[in-house]
Amino acid sequence: MNVNNKLIVIVGAYSTGQYLAPAFISKGYQCIHVQPGATISPFYLDSFRKHDFINNLVWEGDDESIIQELSQFDVKAVIPGSEIAVLLADSLSQKLSLPTTNDPRMSSARRNKYDMQKALEQAGVNSIPVFKTNKSEAIFNWLKSQGIQYPIVLKPISSAGTDGVSICQNQEEVQLAFNELIDTVNALGENNNELLVQPYLHGIEYVVNTVSSNGRHYVTEIIRVNKITINASPVYDYAEVLSPVEHELLYELLSEYVKKVLDALGIHFGAGHSEVMLVNETTPVLIETAARPIGGIDLSAYTESLGYNHISMVAESYLNPENFHKILLPENKLPLRKRLLCTFMISPIHGEICNRPDLMAIKNLPHVHSVLMKTQGVLEKTSTLINCPGFITSLGTNREELMQQHQKIRQYEPHLFLQMVDSTIGLRR
């Protein structure tokens, strides 16, 4: 194997993070992967592309052994590819004394949702009142002391993808959700020893994706998110990329706020994926920020819509910062090349998948760009983004047509999922 010294280290290259290595390889760099633990959740591991790396180093609690392995290379940067990689990437980058290290004092606040909101509060940035506990009675005492009314949100302190999130309308629902969640293992393989409590925010939810370079923050795209509530859990319905030209004032409002968030969390380099609620149409409030790329999207569709994507801009920011600044300077914002709408599939049934889904009717819809659907294993009733059975990405020039197509996809869903679990059809895999 021909190994050069130009090296990028990617920690936890899962989900959309699997495409980081190809982006750097295309620019002449080689990549080493650090697996952030001996055991990785199948939710992540299924997306790992081992062939993109010259080595896969397994971290088992000892940073120094990883540092020793990396010391023979000229490491340009250590980059987290997924949520479970954030803390380890911070630690390795700091110990390698890399100039692209984010503020190590704020590392926990980039992962722990309690510490995150407290960091915003301390910095004077709009935040949500939060409380963490391992006792349900403490929740009720805190709600009373703060004068917080129902509904409230109960969720893990450090998970992702709406995993374990419950919207509770009364004390009984809080107790039920608490009992179901406390001391369980979340979707990322971490223990829910404590839970986070916060008031429910009413408003419109947005995703603000960013890339930072030497403390300068750039918004790559803003996505409006629509969710529905199923059995007290927020479930993704659809998401649409917003035009920075058509929504100029909204872009300015959300961008200015999220940049303050990134400063408060000590993010100077790399990707940011922030979920923001716009309350009363005027006040942005952070739900959470992830210091890694957006997960679970079709990058090719985003490239067609924007002319670039989150991953390509991360690579550009580290290796060609001048061009990166040029592309994302606010005054260079251009209209969308195409409108993008993502439909998240919602299964109302649970069962073993017996048959390949017949997706031809959906694929033949005029604006469908790509279809990603679970085809084996167990089909679960959709309750989180993590057990979402698939998503369909559509591109077009007319928003009304995209929304009509979204509704048509919803009409196909019941038959599609029934067919997948019907053992009498005979198209077994």
What is the meaning of each model-derived region?
Residues 282-284:
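Conserved protein kinase catalytic/activation segment
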Residues 133, 165-170, 211-213, 279:
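Short beta-strand-to-turn element immediately C-terminal to the catalytic PLP-Schiff-base lysine
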Residues 1-106, 137, 321-325, 374-387, ...:
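ATP-binding N-terminal substructure of ATP-dependent carboxylate-amine bond-forming enzymes
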Residues 323-366:
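A glycine-rich beta-turn/hairpin centered on an aromatic-Pro dipeptide
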Residues 94-164, 171:
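A conserved helix-loop-beta module that forms one wall/lid of the active-site cleft
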Residues 272, 362-378:
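A structural supersecondary motif
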Residues 199-267, 271, 278, 290-318:
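ATP-dependent carboxylate/phosphate-activation module, predominantly the ATP-grasp catalytic core
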Residues 126-128, 149-154, 168-203, 233-238, ...:
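Conserved ATP-binding module of the ATP-grasp superfamily
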